């Protein structure tokens, strides 16, 4: 994967990362969060809604990454299973590729996605949901970064800390 090539092929990637598999292979400097949303085909009855309530998902099949690699997704799954059993969950691979988005468009299922991916597929509409789930994004870099990468990361941390004293 490209993640394991950090430090060889390139110094940095910027991306969403809550993956235990990825974080075993790289460092991450968090820069912010993206909200978890739902995507549906343009023909789906929910596609016309400006915002979804969780109850709008009752009776739907929600496609989401399989359990075990993402604490954010695992938390959503646990909450839905416990509090909203009327939502059926279908596992997808841990990392979405175009086949996952195509499957959502073709099946009429609902896909758990991110606000930053709202325009990723022309056949899907991404809709905010009335919940507070999000996933961090940030600067991904090698577990053994060279000195110039370390200096850059320290400089970014310093800038972030000066703008937000609560930044760690």
Residue ranges: model-predicted function:
Residues 55-59, 135-168:
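Extended ligand-binding regions for polar small-molecule ligands
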Residues 24-36, 40-62, 150:
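Flexible hinge/capping segments at coil-to-helix
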Residues 23-29, 33-34, 98-147:
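Beta-alpha-beta core module
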Residues 1-21:
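Central regulatory/effector-binding core of bacterial HTH transcription factors
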Residues 18, 67, 116:
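Flexible loop residues that form catalytic
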Residues 22, 59-84:
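Secondary-structure junction motif
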Residues 1, 65, 85-97:
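Short beta-strand-to-loop elements that line the ligand-binding cleft
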């Amino acid at each position: 994967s490209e993640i394991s090539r950090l430090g060889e092929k390139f110094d940095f990637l910027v991306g969403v990362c809550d993956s235990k598999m990825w974080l075993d292979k790289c460092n991450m400097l968090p820069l912010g969060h993206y909200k978890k949303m739902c995507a549906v085909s343009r023909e789906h009855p929910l596609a016309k809604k400006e915002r979804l309530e969780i109850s709008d998902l009752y009776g739907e099949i929600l496609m989401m990454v399989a359990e075990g690699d993402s604490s954010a997704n695992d938390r959503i799954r646990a909450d839905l299973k416990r509090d909203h059993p009327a939502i059926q969950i279908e596992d997808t691979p841990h990392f979405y590729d175009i086949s996952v988005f195509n499957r959502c468009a073709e099946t009429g299922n609902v896909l758990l996605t991110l606000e930053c991916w709202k325009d990723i597929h022309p056949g899907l509409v991404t809709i905010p949901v009335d919940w507070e789930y999000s996933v961090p994004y940030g600067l991904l870099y090698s577990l053994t970064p060279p000195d110039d990468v370390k200096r850059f990361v320290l400089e970014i941390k310093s800038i972030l800390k000066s703008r937000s004293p609560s930044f760690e």
